[in-house]
Every structure is written in structure tokens, then in C-alpha cells.
Amino acid sequence: MCKGLAGLPASCLRSAKDMKHRLGFLLQKSDSCEHSSSHSKKDKVVTCQRVSQEEVKKWAESLENLINHECGLAAFKAFLKSEYSEENIDFWISCEEYKKIKSPSKLSPKAKKIYNEFISVQATKEVNLDSCTREETSRNMLEPTITCFDEAQKKIFNLMEKDSYRRFLKSRFYLDLTNPSSCGAEKQKGAKSSADCTSLVPQCA
């Protein structure tokens, strides 16, 4: 027969109360994290709504012009993702970020992370490097410096320049941007034409 809460030992009541408090705290923490995460993502997103035709045309002059422009890089990355081959540009971006590290103590862990992700035999996003460059980069991991990925990054840049960059310039990801009528270009008196690229270049993170 149920005797109700009054019939339970004091220790059980304290345990139940403590458990309820913990569950309530965890639920509040979960809601708080989700709310914070959604705001964080919104803060990091920069929408590329307008890119001038002059800028878009410069992207066809060189791969360097393309990937050094925030929206150009986003468009190229979207193209590579559509081909399931974004590991090369991801590696290039990681190398650029690595070279900006100021603290010597942070070089080694970051270098190992890049190596394990893109260069090692069991890399999750292995890039296509020749054996000599791969071995040289492996040796550089013994004492990582700010330049330890320079040769590998150069090889991957050249590979993209000869292959995926040329395909990108022939793809709708680029051609639609060069056609003002296809991505909502607007011409105002005294202003240069620009393309609304929201649908083609959704985000420049």
C-alpha cells in the first residue's frame, strides 16, 4: 500500500529533491547553450548579397584574385563541395590561418591537427601530394615552424590552379555571376552594376 511522501525516509526525500534540482539545472543549461549557439552562428555569417561585375571579372584573371576575395572564396568552395573535392581549398585555408598564429606555443598542436587531417596516411581529408613533398612535410612536423606547410600549400595551390579553378570558370557557379540578368543585377544612375549573388554565394564565413 502506498503511504505517500510522508511515509518515505528523510534520506529518500533529500535524494529525490536533489535529483529534481539537477535535472532542472541541466535543462536550463541545454536551452541556454542552444540559444547561445544560434546567436553565435548568426554573428559569424556574412551574406554576400552584392558583388560588382568588375570584381567578378577579376576572379577570372587568377586563382589568387578569386580566393583572396571573401565572396570569391565562398563561391569556389561551394563549387568544390558540389564536386565532393573541397579538401584542397580547406587545406589551403588551414595553412593561411596557421601562418597567422603569433604564439609559438600554439604552432605545434595546430600543425599536428593540420597534418593529421590533410597529409597523414590516415588523414580524413587527404590532399593529393607527391611523395617527396609529403615526406618533407612529415619531417617538418618534428619541429613545426610557421613555414612548415609552405611547400605543400604551394603544390596544392598549383594543383587547384591547373584543374579545379579552370572548371570553376566554366561552371554555373561563376558564369551565372558574370551574367547580370541571371543574378538580379541592378543599375543605378552613376553607379556600377552589381549582382545579387545570395542564391549562388549564400554565405561568406
From Swiss-Prot:
Tell me the SUPFAM superfamilies matching this sequence. Regulator of G-protein signaling, RGS (SSF48097)
Q: Where is the lipid attached (S-palmitoyl cysteine)?
A: 2, 12, 95
Listed GO molecular functions?
Answer: G-protein alpha-subunit binding; GTPase activator activity; protein kinase binding
Sorted UniProt keywords: Lipoprotein, Palmitate, Phosphoprotein, Signal transduction inhibitor
One GO cellular component assignment for this chain's record is: cytoplasm
Q: Which Gene3D superfamilies match?
A: 1.10.196.10, Regulator of G-protein Signalling 4, domain 2 (1.10.167.10)
Free-text description of this protein's post-translational modifications in UniProt: Either Cys-2 or Cys-12 or both are palmitoylated. Phosphorylated by cyclic GMP-dependent protein kinase.
Q: Which domain of life is it from?
A: Eukaryota
A GO BP annotation: regulation of potassium ion transmembrane transport
Q: Which InterPro entries has this protein been placed in?
A: RGS, RGS_RGS4, RGS_sf, RGS_subdom1/3, RGS_subdomain_2
The record places domain RGS at: 62-178
Q: What does this protein do?
A: Inhibits signal transduction by increasing the GTPase activity of G protein alpha subunits thereby driving them into their inactive GDP-bound form. Activity on G(z)-alpha is inhibited by phosphorylation of the G-protein. Activity on G(z)-alpha and G(i)-alpha-1 is inhibited by palmitoylation of the G-protein.
**What is the protein's given name?**
Regulator of G-protein signaling 4
Q: What organism, scientifically named, is this protein from?
A: Rattus norvegicus
What gene name is given for the protein in this entry?
Rgs4
